[in-house]
Amino acid sequence: MERAMEQLNRLTRSLRRARTVELPEDNETAVYTLMPMVMADQHRSVSELLSNSKFDVNYAFGRVKRSLLHIAANCGSVECLVLLLKKGANPNYQDISGCTPLHLAARNGQKKCMSKLLEYSADVNICNNEGLTAIHWLAVNGRTELLHDLVQHVSDVDVEDAMGQTALHVACQNGHKTTVQCLLDSGADINRPNVSGATPLYFACSHGQRDTAQILLLRGAKYLPDKNGVTPLDLCVQGGYGETCEVLIQYHPRLFQTIIQMTQNEDLRENMLRQVLEHLSQQSESQYLKILTSLAEVATTNGHKLLSLSSNYDAQMKSLLRIVRMFCHVFRIGPSSPSNGIDMGYNGNKTPRSQVFKPLELLWHSLDEWLVLIATELMKNKRDSTEITSILLKQKGQDQDAASIPPFEPPGPGSYENLSTGTRESKPDALAGRQEASADCQDVISMTANRLSAVIQAFYMCCSCQMPPGMTSPRFIEFVCKHDEVLKCFVNRNPKIIFDHFHFLLECPELMSRFMHIIKAQPFKDRCEWFYEHLHSGQPDSDMVHRPVNENDILLVHRDSIFRSSCEVVSKANCAKLKQGIAVRFHGEEGMGQGVVREWFDILSNEIVNPDYALFTQSADGTTFQPNSNSYVNPDHLNYFRFAGQILGLALNHRQLVNIYFTRSFYKHILGIPVNYQDVASIDPEYAKNLQWILDNDISDLGLELTFSVETDVFGAMEEVPLKPGGGSILVTQNNKAEYVQLVTELRMTRAIQPQINAFLQGFHMFIPPSLIQLFDEYELELLLSGMPEIDVSDWIKNTEYTSGYEREDPVIQWFWEVVEDITQEERVLLLQFVTGSSRVPHGGFANIMGGSGLQNFTIAAVPYTPNLLPTSSTCINMLKLPEYPSKEILKDRLLVALHCGSYGYTMA
């Protein structure tokens, strides 16, 4: 009866308190009953449960084998912690990682728990498995107040962890100033190295901790490298920590020159070193000038080494251009720069800032001497060539004028065997000497062209940084004009020099015109690489392109009004952000990514030539489009032409293909190439034939009575439009007919659509600079914009990958390619669009198809077959998910259903 009453009382208490009132007998179950109470510091409940229990307060549980005292110390449950200590909990018990309750209290800054643990003889010198003590944890987190209390109990403030690091090391690394001062005041060794030889100063510099580095240096810290020779300054420069470098230089001035010399080190990231120099140059005018002068001197030394034929060309070239880039960057960001309109000497004024270029004048003088020397040798060889030709003519007994003979080229072995004298030995000694001199000159050009061209590039960079944006240095233009013949000789000998060093051509139309014929003679692939290299210069690194998309930057468009909605969002978007990347989402659809972007360009390009907008008309061949001279029927036509230019510019910028082809004349307008009468054939073939007839025949006695004017329809009325001032009274004759044909061509092909062309180019040039696009002709521009018009199935097969179980020899794959061969060209285009999001193959074929993160081959992945299952695709990675169909017939049926019914629309996979 008494026992039953006791059980009833326990039940009542339990129900009233909504918890158990006694612990289970086994420790494992009991500890999980107590743990939440300890974490909540419910010390009365814990005390009551422990009072009538045999629970072991030192019982270790869980994966890390901690006791309840660990839990209390970790959570700051000071009342429960005291209770457990009074019950006999061991303050020095270590969990599986070697941590004691004191470690956990120190790590989390539980001051009261630490004090109580110390009262109960917690050992502050115990290390965990990594060698960390309680003071290490306090130093890591900068808990200076607690450190003051604890350090008096520590036997060795320089106790090391497993890596030989003391509390001072970690406090310096994390930038805790007061903690560092406390440790130093307590006798910490300021120069103590860890196992790799790194001192506290080294640790402070490794994370750019300027303040802790300054404290250490003020207290006499030594500037010491680690065991690998890496110095604190090396770490500061590697991290771009300009402020910390500044502190090091204050205490060790010799390090200034060390930083300057680091500009030659290819292993150091240029952008980090540039950050350091930028910060240092902002500290004072004198330091700014000192940095620039020092960089100019180093650049001059490197430039002269580059001009030495015994030096390593590649290493010296990279070093010179690297130094000059940094020099120009620092020069521009100074207090006086071209961007803020303050004169810097480019008008001839000898300001202090212009004087920093003085050391470089030695290099430019050497460059000029080299070019003059080569020009002299070239001129001498030309004279010798004429003399040699005369000698050869005399030997043959000919009376022809030497001027009619092609310029002399040094003959190869045996080339004199056909001379009338019959043997090589009969060649005059003077002739041999001149030939050798010519060969020597060619050898000198071969050996020096790249070196001199690199110095020319450096010269251009230095001239440009002294000029306001958009202006080319008159001095540099004069330099190129002076050495025009030699530079063209360099380029003719090695055309790659243009792409490697003559970047100035892209920024100066006057100079570009001198070399354009040479540039356009270079392979299309090389010009494409040069185009995109400079188009994307100055944009974020490639690893930043795939950063998470900002929701505000997504172009949200409506599929049912894609033209107008796209025009609206693109006109409002940030142009610079659109250059970096495009994110498109169709209203009401979830999908995003490169596949959606490709589809957007594909559909939008078709809408641009939609007759409803009256922007473009179809040419005579029915396959290309030309701006519509009557587009004014659409009140917004010029805004729409500007938008069309933006879309084509964006597509070219991001290597996306558009699904339209334009007339040759329109491509010429984009490129700035004059049209000719042959271009008229695209809009009026019969009229083009008439123009051709005029040019091919003598019209003197035909009585055509043509004048330099034409009749044209202006709002339904015929009006006479002069081709030039007073054209109505100027007769077309045999002598001026070519001018007439050109002027009437310009009227039909240019003047009639000039406002439309101007609006289009305004949008196009927002993304594609005119100086870059002129690298191509009209045929190449079509390839860049629209890709290859035909799909080469053999090339498709060659550049396809297989995954998820498929291999090239599998029957399903064999059937698939047989089906691709059988279907129409239009269905192949649908298949390509179904998988990649684009209906065009880029120039270079399927090997150049782009995916979400660069080049991505067409891929076919195996999918288990179920009846009626259709193929699906992942357009971002150009992947066709093809079920393992049991027969070719079923495969073809299901594939065509997917192509004709599922080519548009995106959902999340």
UniProtKB/Swiss-Prot annotation:
Catalytic activity line of the entry: S-ubiquitinyl-[E2 ubiquitin-conjugating enzyme]-L-cysteine + [acceptor protein]-L-lysine = [E2 ubiquitin-conjugating enzyme]-L-cysteine + N(6)-ubiquitinyl-[acceptor protein]-L-lysine
Induction record: Down-regulated in sporadic Wilms tumor.
PTM annotation: Autoubiquitinated.
Resulting phenotype, residue 706 to D: Monomeric; loss of E3 ubiquitin ligase activity
Result of changing residue 876 to A/S: Loss of E3 ubiquitin ligase activity
ANK repeats mapped onto the chain: 23-55, 64-93, 97-126, 130-159, 163-192, 196-226, 228-253
Listed Pfam families: Ank_2, Ank_4, HECT
Outcome when changing residue 332 to A: Promotes ubiquitination of RAC1
Pathway: Protein modification; protein ubiquitination
Uppermost EC category: transferase
Region described as Disordered: 398-433
Effect of residue 353 to A: Promotes ubiquitination of RAC1
The enzyme's E.C. designation: 2.3.2.26
Subcellular location: Golgi apparatus, Golgi stack membrane; Cytoplasm; Endoplasmic reticulum
Sequence segments annotated as region (N-terminal helix important for homodimerization): 1-21
Example GO molecular function: ubiquitin protein ligase activity
UniProt effect for mutating residue 204 to T: Impairs ubiquitination of RAC1
Active site (record annotation): 876
SMART domains: ANK (SM00248), HECTc (SM00119)
GO BP of this protein: Golgi organization; membrane fusion; protein K48-linked ubiquitination; protein ubiquitination; Rac protein signal transduction; regulation of cell migration; ubiquitin-dependent protein catabolic process
Tissue: Expressed in multiple tissues including heart, brain and kidney.
Role summary: E3 ubiquitin-protein ligase involved in Golgi membrane fusion and regulation of small GTPases. Acts as a regulator of Golgi membrane dynamics during the cell cycle: recruited to Golgi membrane by Rab proteins and regulates postmitotic Golgi membrane fusion. Acts by mediating ubiquitination during mitotic Golgi disassembly, ubiquitination serving as a signal for Golgi reassembly later, after cell division. Specifically binds GTP-bound RAC1, mediating ubiquitination and subsequent degradation of active RAC1, thereby playing a role in host defense against pathogens.
Subunit structure: Homodimer. The homodimer is autoinhibited and stabilized by its N-terminal helix. Interacts with RAB1 (RAB1A, RAB1B or RAB1C), RAB4 (RAB4A or RAB4B) and RAB11 (RAB11A or RAB11B); in a GTP-dependent manner. Interacts with the 26S proteasomal complex through the 20S core proteasomal subunit. Interacts with RARB.
Disease: Defects in HACE1 are a cause of Wilms tumor (WT). WT is a pediatric malignancy of kidney and one of the most common solid cancers in childhood. HACE1 is epigenetically down-regulated in sporadic Wilms tumor. Moreover, a t(5;6)(q21;q21) translocation that truncates HACE1 has been found in a child with bilateral, young-onset Wilms tumor.
PANTHER family in the cross-refs: E3 UBIQUITIN-PROTEIN LIGASE HACE1, HECT DOMAIN UBIQUITIN-PROTEIN LIGASE
Protein name in the entry: E3 ubiquitin-protein ligase HACE1
Gene: HACE1
